[in-house]
Amino acid sequence: MTTDELTKSLEAFTHFTRAEWAQLNDGHSAPLTEKERKNLEGIYETISEAEVNDVYMPLSELLYKRMVHNVRLHDDLNRFLKRERKRVPFVIGIAGSVAVGKSTTARLIQALASRWPGSPKVELVTTDGFLYPNEVLEKRGLMKRKGFPESYDIRSLLTFLTDLKAGTPVVKAPMYSHLTYNIEKDHIQTLIEPDVVIVEGINVLQVNRKGKRMPHVFVSDFFDFSIYVDAEEKDILSWYIERFQLLRNTAFQKPESYFHRYRDLTDEEAVAMAESIWHTINGVNLEKNIKPTRLRADLILTKGAHHRVEQVQLRK
């Protein structure tokens, strides 16, 4: 995309500074205690009360208004069509790079949405569960392409979303273990008539144009609202290295960890390994497959160097 094309695309968004966005919060304090915020934090990022009040409270209110609009439209159409069609879940998609903090954003939105009027049932699903199992990736020579579009069972993900939006009472999703770096064969996430479903993953806004047999429908077609969590690559790389070092001292120490072989790396070796993985896999995926999708989002959250959201862009 040229600079002119990018500028034109960004004109489709209303831009808010953090201060401007924070003003949309009409004096409401976050309904989360300090302990609850701590439980929602990632392993290397904190969630301040100011971050919740300034950024996520207005976002939560916006999402609630969008959901209420959908409900009213559904009821109006039922009256017009003289049908009693079942109400289906409000689906929110959250995309962004590895290590950008999208999982924390997803958990925060889940916590706030569950406190909306009526206490809706809110489920969070990650697309990691729709990665092909390691044995399949190894057979296809794709282990070093894990996270790239071809490493996902997109058909299964689309089937899951189709069932969800068809109002199927019970929908199941596979689960993924970041410890074993593989699908958990003995665990399934079961969603029973949820009101809101958050689908989080690096690939949720991607448009797969490769392969004649791929369906002409995309994951994002099922979203009622989509969010892209953005940041400068140098900052994301810094966070990735920090996360790698923390995991080296914690999860990697466990014998069952896929990355157990990295447990004894020195600080210098850990940094070098994290940088190598980034520049050969995650950084390449970000540049080619993830970042180009941000302009497909309804809202972009742009973070600064300290995980603090500095700018919000909302599609007009």
UniProtKB/Swiss-Prot annotation:
GO CC aspect terms: cytoplasm
Stretch forming the signal peptide: none
Catalytic activity line of the entry: (R)-pantothenate + ATP = (R)-4'-phosphopantothenate + ADP + H(+)
Catalytic class of the enzyme: transferase
Keyword terms, alphabetized: ATP-binding, Coenzyme A biosynthesis, Cytoplasm, Kinase, Nucleotide-binding, Transferase
InterPro entries per the UniProt record, alphabetical: P-loop_NTPase, PanK, PRK/URK
PANTHER family assigned to the protein according to its UniProt record, in alphabetical order: URIDINE KINASE (PTHR10285)
UniProt name for this protein: Pantothenate kinase
Biological source species: Shouchella clausii (strain KSM-K16)
GN (gene name): coaA
